[in-house]
Amino acid sequence: MPGPRGAAGGLAPEMRGAGAAGLLALLLLLLLLLLGLGGRVEGGPAGERGAGGGGALARERFKVVFAPVICKRTCLKGQCRDSCQQGSNMTLIGENGHSTDTLTGSGFRVVVCPLPCMNGGQCSSRNQCLCPPDFTGRFCQVPAGGAGGGTGGSGPGLSRTGALSTGALPPLAPEGDSVASKHAIYAVQVIADPPGPGEGPPAQHAAFLVPLGPGQISAEVQAPPPVVNVRVHHPPEASVQVHRIESSNAESAAPSQHLLPHPKPSHPRPPTQKPLGRCFQDTLPKQPCGSNPLPGLTKQEDCCGSIGTAWGQSKCHKCPQLQYTGVQKPGPVRGEVGADCPQGYKRLNSTHCQDINECAMPGVCRHGDCLNNPGSYRCVCPPGHSLGPSRTQCIADKPEEKSLCFRLVSPEHQCQHPLTTRLTRQLCCCSVGKAWGARCQRCPTDGTAAFKEICPAGKGYHILTSHQTLTIQGESDFSLFLHPDGPPKPQQLPESPSQAPPPEDTEEERGVTTDSPVSEERSVQQSHPTATTTPARPYPELISRPSPPTMRWFLPDLPPSRSAVEIAPTQVTETDECRLNQNICGHGECVPGPPDYSCHCNPGYRSHPQHRYCVDVNECEAEPCGPGRGICMNTGGSYNCHCNRGYRLHVGAGGRSCVDLNECAKPHLCGDGGFCINFPGHYKCNCYPGYRLKASRPPVCEDIDECRDPSSCPDGKCENKPGSFKCIACQPGYRSQGGGACRDVNECAEGSPCSPGWCENLPGSFRCTCAQGYAPAPDGRSCLDVDECEAGDVCDNGICSNTPGSFQCQCLSGYHLSRDRSHCEDIDECDFPAACIGGDCINTNGSYRCLCPQGHRLVGGRKCQDIDECSQDPSLCLPHGACKNLQGSYVCVCDEGFTPTQDQHGCEEVEQPHHKKECYLNFDDTVFCDSVLATNVTQQECCCSLGAGWGDHCEIYPCPVYSSAEFHSLCPDGKGYTQDNNIVNYGIPAHRDIDECMLFGSEICKEGKCVNTQPGYECYCKQGFYYDGNLLECVDVDECLDESNCRNGVCENTRGGYRCACTPPAEYSPAQRQCLSPEEMDVDECQDPAACRPGRCVNLPGSYRCECRPPWVPGPSGRDCQLPESPAERAPERRDVCWSQRGEDGMCAGPLAGPALTFDDCCCRQGRGWGAQCRPCPPRGAGSHCPTSQSESNSFWDTSPLLLGKPPRDEDSSEEDSDECRCVSGRCVPRPGGAVCECPGGFQLDASRARCVDIDECRELNQRGLLCKSERCVNTSGSFRCVCKAGFARSRPHGACVPQRRR
């Protein structure tokens, strides 16, 4: 192959130049030789068969030669040197589509595909093209919107499925050419940076469409030139360029040119799986982004290409400026070097831009409907909502403040003529108001910026926030339709050249096809009539074409040919405006209908001439309120009259009007000094003599005060009267000063009338303030001595003697004088220790007395001595006891068979235990007579089980304290057992287990299943309930107290469960216990019957786990059950109660007597359910592991609850079975590898692992009152109990501690 080597050698200097730039250049020469590609179409003209009409490709052959030249740069001490060497050639030959079409070299891979993929498609295999979303067909030549048309033009061609239809597809090369006669040589140049340490991201690939020669044009089909797809796999930091070097055909030979550049990016290329981050819409002055990102994660291209201004993961970055310069006609969207997609689009591949579906981004149009448009989106808010500041969510409208609306503002800035109805500021200022609010806030002047801010639609219109529609148009431009009649209708642009200049590319508009090189990326477009929607502001214009449905945007101040942007067709469905905007007609009914909607208006409204909105009928044009009498306010469907001052509203058959108000009909309107004269719209007051008109609102006639004139009464006091005045002489204590006034006489300055005391002058008189011990005389003009002894409130417990200005006290015996010497206080003799020895000293007035405690007497008046009751009365405690004296009392020591009475002062016969009486649960309860557990029971049955007292008719004998001598005497075998003297075994009385379930019935296990055990009982509750030992019943578990049960929802507790209400469209996931969106819902793997066999599948968030039945154990992954390899690896088998019955409600009954069994042992006997959860046993013979020889045990211990002699102890039998097991207070359980000690409930193993010790629940589990709220916790053997605090007792009906009533 000398030709290719020579071509390669010719390019070596260029590659050395690239190496001088610090890059590694790899030059690959591709010799693409295609031979004998041809075929025919049955039924087609003969003339077309020679051209290779559209039959299937009969055979194909190509040959690729790779001649690499490897260059590298070496730098030392600032001096760099380039060195290149020739690599070994590689040749690839493919024939009939069966050979390998891929070659791999060091750091690169080249794929040659002869299939011509059109419209930006990529050849993914030898017989398939990977098409963009808007095209289909085998060669991506059919638009997705229709079967015909596209880049290849209309007419016969390929169908959507890719099968050949009537027509012709030219071959890739003319038929009959050979390898030597015609070929094209291209150079594929891969430029890469030197690799760094470690392995980088996976390799990228670049695809190129290489033309082999000119195409053919026919009347029916416009075919592209013969092409071949070349794909180069290269490192991600590399760039790929393709150069055409030479061609053996002299006509098509051309100098080396740059073809299909693939520029090297300025930053490392992202991996195939693009990262997700936070999208921000707002920016701060000194920060790249705000503090409130959109919810969820998005890709950078989706964020920055649509609504975002900044994006980032751990750090926020501003979105880069778009370098978009325009995209050409419909079909493949091809951009120049460094070009970006337009706003609202992202790059699909190297040749296509795809619309960004903003509605799929989380957080867009929350609480509203999102409509995706090509390059934008639209938010439609429901009634009562409007778009928020971020333009991405609908927020509820806040009610605006309503206040007075004033029709007039005076020059003195006073508000006048308020309307009777309170209005919002916008509704006031946009209609007839001049000022608004309690502070008389002026409305902005019409035409100013402030007026446009609150009244954007002008005078007479206001914004209905529930109808606001926001539409994104182009480069983040927004239009808010506030027209009262709806959005403006689109206007038809004139098509004359004088009004609309044609674009520069006139050939494409006229549909003329040119044969241009592939590098120019030109396509054919047929012209169609255009209809342009022109917004009111200079936003980019939206041009729509009927076929194909494309959109073109024009930026302001630029010619259409430079700013036009064509976007790939997007399917748009018809929008039901009546459904999306429920109040679109206002006061009317929206009627949908083709092509648009119409409005049927309510009474009082009329349809706008454009029939897009219902407007109110303005009744005020006829001046129904009367000229000059009031202001007519038009309202929705009616009108109101706001009458001026002096007029009133009149409602008659003709409507509302303003009539004159006769103010003079109101009595005393002008006061008592005048009379009223009525005028139209006002009135006037005329005053009588002696009165004058007062300037007030309303004006009245007021009296003239003649006494203000000093000359009215020169020798006396002037007294004003209505309409006149009167002169009066001065009173005693006053002197005339002339001018009609009297002046007070100061008596205190003329002498000392108040000695001993102080004189105080008063108007017309004076007053004496006397010293202590003195009081004013009856006339108040002197001071007299006070006799304090006559008052009787001084010198208590003493004798009083009066002195001038004071008094003296002489105290009686047992009293002493107080500190203020005003009375006598008692002496507390009890403060002296010897006053009352051995008793209680009680102080009295003037003396004291000594009280001795019971059983003592007073000796000598100051000492208490014990009384010996036994010596004084020898008959005490007889005849069944002896008296024993105590300090202050005595007790009886009773004979055998007798017991002391409750007061310890007598002896009574001990009740025999076989007597049957009532058993009481709570002896301390205030209503303990109602706490009867059972009747007709013996004292042993009551006190040896659950009883706290035993007796008849509320005469209760307390049960002996547990572990006391009396308890062991009554219950020798402990709790849960009773003696039966009628049955003996070798002289020893038999012990019978107390069946608490039968004895007390439902009193001890309400809402549950009571199961008798030996000893004691167990209460099994349904799922969702727990057993309350204080209330002796099953109580519903409030799952809502645990917030993790219903995350992101509203939890509602139910009996036995709970309900989690989620906000649609979210649904509740029981596995994750939270409300999740449909995309986040967990897949329940346990729905597969084969999961976890033979065990139970437990679904987990995003996974599941297996609970295996012994002897099966979970596998290493936890998602299957396996048999252990050795007996030592088998899981220990758990033992529990075995049930003989299991109902349809899932409740078990009839526990089998005897010790607890494993699941297999229970189900292999006669069990139907196992465990506290009533796990069902499998059907008989359905894969059972039961041995055939196993049968139900008939031992006496298993079948009868009656135990002769002592019941077998677990620890004794364990020691007999295994010498190596020691288990005190527990039982030995055989396990693989040896027996272990297992403790009963309420016990735990100690450090030696051989003894079961009681768990102190009150100390370990009662933190913060979790066990006994507001009660005292008392630990018991294996359990605990809650006891009410002092002064409280438990209420039987409710089980709560209530204050104890005193009797």
Swiss-Prot record:
Keyword NAD annotated: no
One MF annotation (Gene Ontology) recorded for this entry: transforming growth factor beta binding
Comp. bias intervals (Polar residues): 1188-1198
Region Disordered, annotated ranges: 247-282, 478-552, 1188-1219
CDD domains in the record: EGF_CA
Signal sequence annotation: 1-43
Glycosylation, residue list: 89, 349, 845, 936, 1275
PROSITE patterns in the cross-refs: ASX_HYDROXYL (PS00010), EGF_1 (PS00022), EGF_2 (PS01186), EGF_3 (PS50026), EGF_CA (PS01187), TB (PS51364)
Disulfide partners: 113-123, 117-129, 131-140, 279-303, 289-316, 304-319, 359-370, 365-379, 381-394, 405-428, 415-440, 429-443, 430-455, 578-590, 585-599, 601-614, 620-632, 625-641, 664-676, 670-685, 687-701, 748-759, 754-768, 770-783, 789-800, 795-809, 811-824, 830-841, 836-850, 852-864, 870-883, 877-892, 894-907, 919-942, 929-954, 943-959, 944-971, 997-1010, 1005-1019, 1021-1034, 1040-1051, 1046-1060, 1062-1075, 1086-1097, 1092-1106, 1108-1121, 1138-1162, 1148-1174, 1163-1177, 1164-1186, 1258-1273, 1268-1282
Subcellular location: Secreted; Secreted, Extracellular space, Extracellular matrix
Domain (TB): residue spans on this chain: 277-331, 403-455, 917-971, 1136-1186
GO annotation, cellular component aspect: collagen-containing extracellular matrix; extracellular exosome; extracellular region
Superkingdom of the source species: Eukaryota
Tissues in which the UniProt entry reports expression: Isoform 2: Expressed prominently in heart, skeletal muscle, prostate, testis, small intestine and ovary. Isoform 1: Strongly expressed in pancreas and liver.
Effect on the protein of changing residue 696 to C: In GPHYSD3; uncertain significance; no effect on TGF-beta secretion
Keywords: Amelogenesis imperfecta, Disease variant, Disulfide bond, Dwarfism, EGF-like domain, Extracellular matrix, Glycoprotein, Growth factor binding, Repeat, Secreted, Signal
Family note: Belongs to the LTBP family.
This protein's name: Latent-transforming growth factor beta-binding protein 3
Species for this entry: Homo sapiens (Human)
Gene that encodes it: LTBP3
